[in-house]
């Protein structure tokens, strides 16, 4: 059973650690509008729930559907947004030229690179599928003031490759392996957080 959002918020509050943050990903598909919520009302409802829980400063909202992120940036600038991208056969929300239904009117052809698209959209955090990242993109994004996160990085070789690229964060189902790789490199490790359901 998936917990309701209110249950998740209650768990976070019970943990009692103000450093505990939430990353909430919207699952809206502009290619299947009859199967998912409309982005603007959904984003507004999500913002209201986060604010009502008093967790706006501890929550980031992620989405492949940038329309959602544009609404959140307008309605709740205090809530960080994270621009998700994939440029794969199984999902390409960025496209190769004109704007796609995913990118809220921002087009690769108009900006020349994904980091520039995200910057133009008002984004500050880019979370890319790890297999799409290279050193030049990471460097460009960071020079534009973007934080770069890589997802979902579970294999030791992939983790090492992302650390070599200098990404700002790694999304992983195996945080133990990420921490081990960071420790081997002498990188500072964040303290763990204990949460009892």
Residue ranges and their predicted role:
Residues 83-84, 91-197:
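C-terminal active-site rim and adjoining tail of enzyme catalytic domains
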